[in-house]
C-alpha cells in the first residue's frame, strides 16, 4: 500500500481536544491507524451491535448501518471521545459476504469469488461524544480475483488466513490472485479507507450531523423489521 494519509482530529488546536477511540477489535484496523501516525485507544463495540443482514438492504446500506450501531454502542459507554467505527463486507453477484463462519463457509465464498470481479464496501462512522455529532460514509473498492486452482484454494484454506475476514480473504496477505482495479483504495479492502477517513476528519465540523440520543436504542425499532 502507498503511504497512508493522516489528518488532524477535530478541535486538535483546542486546550482539551477529544481523543480518538477505535470501536473495533480488528488488529488490521489498528495497524492501519498506527501506520498513519494516529494516537488512539481501543474500545470494541459489543457483539449485540451487529445484528446481521436485513433482507432488503444493499451492501452499502448494511455497512453504513452497522458502522453507526458500533459507534453508538461505544458512545453510550463513554463520557468523552471521538469514536471511530467501521464495518466491511464483500459483495459479488448480489451476494453480501461477511466473515465466514467456518472452513466450509470460507470455501463457499472463495468459489463464488473465483474468476470474478467484486466489490468491497466499508462503512465508516465518526462520532463526537462531546458535541453529540456524527458522520457516516461508505467507500467502495473494486477487486479482481483470478480463477483459483484447487491447490491455491486448499493452501489458502489450510493457512487459516480467511478467518475473521470479509469474503474469506485478506488483501494485506499479498495473494497474487487478488488485485485492486484502478486507483481504488487498498486500505478500504483491509478494513478502513484511510484516504476517506482523513477527509472525514478534516471536514467533520462542517459535515457532521447533530444527534440527541447517543445510544443505539433509537434505531432498535428499525432493526426489528429485518428478516
Curated annotation (Swiss-Prot):
Its main location: cytoplasm. One of its GO terms (molecular function) is dTTP diphosphatase activity. Residues 1-21 are annotated as: Disordered. GO terms for biological process: nucleotide metabolic process. Its cofactor is a divalent metal cation. It catalyses: dTTP + H2O = dTMP + diphosphate + H(+); UTP + H2O = UMP + diphosphate + H(+). Keywords: Cytoplasm, Hydrolase, Nucleotide metabolism. It comes from the Bacteria. It holds the Pfam family Maf. The active site is at residue 87. CDD domains: Maf. GO terms for cellular component: cytoplasm. Its EC number is 3.6.1.9. It is found in: Cytoplasm. HAMAP family: Maf (MF_00528). NCBIfam families: maf. Nucleoside triphosphate pyrophosphatase that hydrolyzes dTTP and UTP. May have a dual role in cell division arrest and in preventing the incorporation of modified nucleotides into cellular nucleic acids. Belongs to the Maf family. YhdE subfamily. PANTHER family: BIFUNCTIONAL DTTP/UTP PYROPHOSPHATASE/METHYLTRANSFERASE PROTEIN-RELATED, BIFUNCTIONAL DTTP_UTP PYROPHOSPHATASE_METHYLTRANSFERASE PROTEIN-RELATED. This is dTTP/UTP pyrophosphatase. It comes from Rhodopirellula baltica (strain DSM 10527 / NCIMB 13988 / SH1). The lineage of its organism: Bacteria, Pseudomonadati, Planctomycetota, Planctomycetia, Pirellulales.
Amino acid at each position: 500500500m502507498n503511504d497512508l494519509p493522516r489528518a488532524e482530529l477535530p478541535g486538535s488546536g483546542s486546550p482539551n481536544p477529544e481523543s480518538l477511540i477505535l470501536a473495533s477489535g480488528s488488529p488490521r484496523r489498528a495497524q492501519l491507524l498506527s501506520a498513519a501516525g494516529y494516537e488512539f485507544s481501543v474500545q470494541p463495540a459489543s457483539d449485540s451491535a451487529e445484528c446481521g443482514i436485513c433482507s432488503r438492504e444493499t451492501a452499502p446500506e448494511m455497512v453504513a448501518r452497522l458502522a453507526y450501531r458500533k459507534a453508538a454502542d461505544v458512545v453510550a459507554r463513554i463520557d468523552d471521545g471521538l469514536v471511530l467505527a467501521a464495518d466491511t463486507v464483500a459483495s459479488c453477484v448480489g451476494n453480501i459476504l461477511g466473515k465466514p463462519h467456518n472452513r466450509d463457509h470460507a470455501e463457499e465464498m472463495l468459489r463464488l469469488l473465483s474468476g470474478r470481479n467484486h466489490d468491497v464496501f466499508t462503512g465508516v462512522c465518526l462520532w463526537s461524544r462531546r458535541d453529540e455529532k456524527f458522520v457516516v460514509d461508505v467507500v467502495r473498492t473494486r477487486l479482481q480475483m483470478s480463477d483459483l486452482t484447487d491447490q491455491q484454494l486448499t493452501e489458502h484454506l489450510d493457512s487459516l488466513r480467511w478467518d475473521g475476514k470479509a469474503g474469506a480473504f485478506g488483501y494485506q496477505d499479498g495473494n497474487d490472485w487478488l488485485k485492486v482495479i484502478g486507483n481504488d483504495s487498498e486500505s478500504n479492502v483491509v478494513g478502513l479507507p484511510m484516504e476517506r477517513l482523513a477527509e472525514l476528519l478534516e471536514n467533520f465540523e462542517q459535515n457532521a450531523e447533530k444527534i440527541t440520543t447517543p445510544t443505539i436504542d433509537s434505531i432498535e425499532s428499525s432493526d426489528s423489521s429485518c428478516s
